[in-house]
Each structure stands twice: as C-alpha cells, then as structure tokens.
From Swiss-Prot:
It catalyses: riboflavin(in) = riboflavin(out). Expressed in intestine. The lineage of its organism: Eukaryota, Metazoa, Ecdysozoa, Nematoda, Chromadorea. This is Riboflavin transporter rft-1. GO terms for biological process: embryo development ending in birth or egg hatching; riboflavin transport. The keyword Cell membrane applies.
Length: 427
C-alpha cells in the first residue's frame, strides 16, 4: 500500500510537468500585457507560437512511426524535461526583455522561451503517455491527475499573487492593486515545481517502477463497473476480489473492431478539442462579463475539478460505448452553453448578473469534470490488451490533434473575425 501511494504520487508529480510551463505563462497574461509592448495583442502572438510548437509531435510521429526509427524514450523524456526547466528559469530573468523584430519592438525572449515550453508540453502527449504504458494501469490515472495539477498549480499561484484584483472609481475606471509577488517570482516557483517533476521521473526510473507492471493497486472496496455486454449493460457493485474476476470477463481490446478503436480515438480528439482549444479560447468572454471573481472561480474551480475527475475512474469504470457516447454528447452540449454565453458578451444571459454567474461557473465545472473523466476513461480503454504502448502513442497523438484542431478553429473566430466581444471591467 505504501509503495503504491509513493509511486502514485511520483507519477502525478511527473504528469504535472506536461503543461505547467505553458499554463504558467497563460496565468500571468494580465500582468504581461500591462508591461510588454504588444499589449492585449500579446495573447494572439503567444497562441500562434504554441500552435507552431504543435509541429513537434508531428515530427516525432513521422520519425517514430513513419521512418520506424527506434528512439530511446527515457533519455528523450529527461532531455525535454531539462529543456522545460531551462526555459522556465529563463522566464524568471528575461520575460520582460524586448528587441526589434522587423522594425517593431517585440518580446522575443518571451516568444523563444514559450516556444521551448510549448514544444515540451505538446510532445508530452506522444512521448510521456507511451512511457506510462509500462506501468500498472492504475498509474495512468495518476498521470492524468498530474495533468490536472499542471493547470491547478499556476492558477492557485495566480490567485495568491492577486494578478487581477482591482477597484472602480466614480468614472468607471478600473485601478489594479499591485500583486503580492512579482512575475519573476511566479515563474521561479513554477521552475521549482518543474524541477520536482524531473526528480520524480528520475526516482521512478531509478526504483524501476515502470518495469514492475504487476504491482496491484488497492482497488476501492466498492467500485462500479459499467460494462458493455453482448446485448445489455450491467452495473455491479463489487469488492476487491470480484472486481478482478469481473474485469477478466471483459473482451480484450486487442480483439476489438476497427470501429471501436476509431470511436475511442475520434472521441478522444473531440473531447480534447473542446477542453484545450474551444473552452480555453472563449471562457474569459463567458465569465468576465459578469465579474472578475466569476472568471477566477470558474477557472480555479475547474482546475480543482479536473484532477478529481481523473481520479474518479478508480471508482466508476464505464466501458459501454453508448454510455461514453452519451457523456461525450453531454460534454459537447455544456461546451455549447459556454460558447453561447461568450457570444452574448458584453450582454448578460436573461439580463441577470446572478443567473449568468451561476450558469457560467456551473457550465465550466461540468465541462471540466466530463472532459477530464472522459479523457482518462478513453486512455484506459485504449491501454487494455496488446500493443498498449502503440495504442497510448496514438491516444496521445489524437489528444494533440484534437487540441490543435480546436485552437485552429477558434483562433480566427476570436482574433481575426472578432466574433466575441469583451465587456468593460467597470459597469
């Protein structure tokens, strides 16, 4: 039990390195835009840089799968994690440096360092996930819990820092309070978290946890298995011993049809398009129109829900494709509500600030919970059976494909055609 919990914590810390770099920059945007010459155009430039970095997984996939070149996974993971540490440390000292690019003053050190972080974050989907195939299946949940922490840690730090606290004068002009600690200190704290992730990875490799795939997790005493049978869906409450017997009766995913595999991969892409591309692009428009606190509660509580929902797979395991399809539909409808709220900005839904606040926060939490749970459940199903490392590679690839597609769709809508409009801070 102690060994399991120790390994679980190490995997979660390792998983937190997946997107903490990019998320840390995003959570500082309110301070960065006030200081840097790009102003509120800065998010558009940074979004473009992150999307260019998404070419990293494509290049890796071509080398690994197309050319069939054998790439040593462990050294490569270590190199990328060290690169993330270097870029995170560089942000502490050079985030506000500028220089001339094509005759205009640009924050090119920030561009370069974010590009390095985004490369690591993007390629983690196709590099870190296959590495997790060597662990016991329960530790895949721990990895996704860590992915949730990669958003939760920067958002909590941002709340403590007080990046967007302000008061309004009689002329409806916002005046921002100074942050409790500087941008450099914020990036330094995230640097230490990234170093902790590197240390966790090295300890995992040193103790050989990835080779001990027979390590059994303590199954919850009462877990719910929802399984797709030949013609019915059964729900059974089982204890530890009967849980393994029931699991063994499930057809091995290696014999699953191509349609089942295609469903899992395509829904993985769809869920991640909503989670990492669509919601993140419009959430500020859907919440800031009601208040700054509404935005902070929506973002922070969503980041709390995400790792908790990832852990839910320990207790509720759904293998029925119709039920998973229904949950995916529910997540899509919730995402549609967020888009609708964003499209209404700067107006309130039902002309009510209270109703809008409740709906915007609730929809953000429901979407975050469903997206996180479905992402873990799809990965767990893809991991089952033979060729689990290859299946998790394609799971990671479709996570990145979905995220890129969602961002690519929303970028012109938000930044080119400007279909969404921000509300004044004071009204």
């Amino acid at each position: 039990m102690k060994t399991f919990l120790f390994t679980f914590c190490l995997v979660a810390i390792f998983g937190s390195s997946s997107w903490i770099g990019t998320n840390s920059v995003w959570m500082e945007l309110s301070l960065l835009t006030a200081k840097l010459p790009e102003g509120w155009n800065l998010p558009s430039y940074l979004s473009a840089i992150v999307q260019i970095a998404c070419l990293g997984p494509l290049i890796y996939s071509i080398i690994h799968k197309g050319i069939k070149m054998t790439i040593p996974t462990v050294p490569l993971i270590f190199i990328f994690m060290v690169l993330a540490c270097i870029c995170q440390l560089g942000l502490c000292f050079f985030w506000d440096d500028t220089g001339y690019i094509f005759g205009a003053i640009r924050s090119w050190p920030l561009y370069l360092l974010l590009f390095g972080l985004a490369i690591v974050d993007a390629i983690s989907s196709v590099l870190f996930l296959p590495f997790m195939a060597q662990f016991h299946p329960s530790f895949l949940n721990a990895y996704f819990v860590g992915m949730g922490l990669s958003a939760l840690i920067p958002s909590l730090l941002s709340l403590i820092q007080g990046t967007s606290n302000y008061w309004c004068d009689d002329n409806k002009t916002p005046h921002y309070y100074p942050p409790r600690f500087s941008v450099s200190m914020f990036f330094l704290i995230n640097f230490f978290f990234t170093c902790a992730a590197v240390a966790a990875f090295l300890v995992l490799y040193k103790i050989g946890a990835h080779k001990n795939s027979s390590q059994v997790e303590p199954e919850p005493k009462h877990s719910i298995q929802i399984i797709q049978g030949d013609s019915t869906t059964d729900v059974n409450e089982v204890n530890t011993e009967s849980s393994f017997q029931e699991t063994s009766s499930i057809p091995d995913s290696s014999s699953a049809t191509g349609a089942r595999l295609a469903f899992l991969l395509l829904t993985t892409a769809l869920v991640n398009a909503q989670m990492n591309g669509i919601v993140t692009s419009v959430q500020s428009y859907a919440t800031l129109v009601y208040s700054q606190n509404t935005y902070h509660y929506a973002v922070t509580l969503s980041n709390v829900i995400s790792p908790l929902a990832s852990y839910l797979q320990f207790f509720v395991k759904i293998r029925s494709l119709p039920i998973l399809a229904f949950l995916t539909l529910c997540s899509s409808l919730t995402t549609a509500v967020i888009i609708y709220l964003a499209a209404l900005s700067p107006n309130w839904i039902f002309n009510s600030e209270t109703a809008g606040t409740i709906i915007s926060i609730a929809s953000s939490l429901i979407a975050a919970g469903l997206h996180s749970y479905l992402r873990v459940m799809f990965a767990a199903l893809l991991r089952e059976g033979n060729q689990k490392e290859s299946r998790l590679f394609w799971c990671g690839a479709f996570i990145q494909i979905g995220s890129f597609t969602g961002s690519a769709i929303m970028f012109p809508l938000v930044n080119v055609w400007k279909l969404f409009h921000s509300a004044p801070s004071c009204r």
